[in-house]
Amino acid sequence: MRWKRMERRPPLTPLRRSRTQSSGGGLTICPRCALKLPKATRISERPWASTWQLNQHIQVSKTKKATAYLKAPREWGQCTHQDPDWSKRLGRGAFGIIVPISEDLCVKQFDSRREFFYEAIANDLMQATRERYPMHSGGSRLLGFVQPCIPCRSIVYPRMKCNLLQLDWSQVNLSVMAAEFTGLMAAVSFLNRYCGMVHCDVSPDNILATGDLTPMNPGRLVLTDFGSVALHSGSKWTNLVVTSNLGFKQHCYDFRVPPKLICKHLYKPSCVLFQCYLSSLGKMHAQVLDQPYPISPNMGLTIDMSSLGYTLLTCLELYLDLPLNNPLKFLGSATRDGRPEPMYYLGFMIPRVVMTQILSAVWTMTLDLGLDCTGKAQAIPMRQEHQLAFQKQCYLYKANQKAESLANCSDKLNCPMLKSLVRKLLERDFFNHGGHPHTRGLVF
């Protein structure tokens, strides 16, 4: 009778009471019963907090100094997605392959279990933060997963139309593209300020489009691929440990990053290429290239914003239809006698230096990256052989561009919004130690 009287009364807390008694004689909360409650019965000041408690996101089981021990949700261990079409392949990389499931879904299959957990955790942290700040416009520009699947070692994502390199740039509208890249700027800012993360791999391959960037079918641009994300030094945790349900360690992640692994070389910030160049020279900087370092929030914003800016420069080259041949053919060899070749890293400065020179002439403004086409750098006296080689390669790169396309640059680039956008994206970067002096961050 006692239990029946209690069951007729509404519970005093949003959790169900179990019939077990504690050591003091009082009733305890049954965790199994609590997990079965629907969302509406939970009382919380923030929807994000209730979502976290409902075990839909990863949970922090314990902490130790700056290390967080994480436990994956039970839902991740259940394979409920459809079988992918293995006969078709949408993409491939060092992680594995991407294959379609349907017209709206695709699956990213990982070769490594460690890499799978890394991207799943980073994506889940981003989505949890996005639920906490639903009004921030940048959150909607980050592509979240649909479902991770531990048994299949794969992550289900929404299927987009294409990436930026696959767009038909002859039909793209500059005003639409500028508006979409402004949204991507908000995404990078959201990731840095609210998520405490640095993407570290912003490039045309990792920016997906849902439309054609035309007035009739503008679509949206979203940033994807969180497999290279790093937590910056402003976040609460610097190390993450994935544990099993029994508490055993499975994978440990340290978010210090060496300069050579920050972004693809073609979109790597100039300040990072500067460190790679110094490291390839040897002497006191010989160990910089492979040495992992923590990334400060300011430097993290410089990395992602600058990479987004160089992605935009690549898109403008495609829009103007400038290059006759592949720009990468002007790069030198990566190594010589087992050591990194200095001109190899300087070669990745060539496309951006030439393009900023063109834009500076068209828009009558100064876009200074700290290195010009003559090979003169403001931060360091360049070796004469490197300066002459860089000057020669810049000349060849200009000769590789179509003359008729260069003649029409002024008419095709008549977009004030785009001019302001390029300046904002590149204002933090400089070919020196740490970026532009007024936005410098400590990373090395």
From Swiss-Prot:
Enzyme Commission code(s) on record: 2.7.11.1
PTM note: AUtophosphorylated.
Residues the entry annotates as binding ATP: L90, G91, R92, G93, A94, F95, G96, I97, I98, K108
Main location as per UniProt: host cell
Coiled-coil segments on the chain, per record: none
Region (Disordered): 1-25
Organism of this sequence: Human herpesvirus 8 type P (isolate GK18) (HHV-8)
Protein name per UniProt: Viral protein kinase
Active site, UniProt feature: D201 (proton acceptor)
Subunit details: Interacts with protein K-bZIP/K8. Interacts with host beta-catenin/CTNNB1.
Effect of substituting K108Q: Complete loss of autophosphorylation
One GO CC term, this protein: host cell nucleus
Catalytic activity: L-seryl-[protein] + ATP = O-phospho-L-seryl-[protein] + ADP + H(+); L-threonyl-[protein] + ATP = O-phospho-L-threonyl-[protein] + ADP + H(+)
InterPro entries, alphabetized: Kinase-like_dom_sf, Prot_kinase_dom
Keywords: ATP-binding, Host nucleus, Kinase, Nucleotide-binding, Transferase
Localisation per UniProt entry: Host nucleus
Single GO MF descriptor: ATP binding
Segments crossing the lipid bilayer: none
Function of the molecule: Serine/threonine protein kinase that plays a role in viral gene expression, viral DNA replication and encapsidation, and nuclear egress of virions. Regulates host transcriptional activity through interactions with RNA helicase and c-Jun N-terminal kinase (JNK) and viral transcriptional activity through interactions with the viral protein K-bZIP/K8. Induces host chromosome condensation and phosphorylation of histone H3. Phosphorylates the DNA polymerase processivity factor hence modulating its processivity function.
Enzyme class: transferase
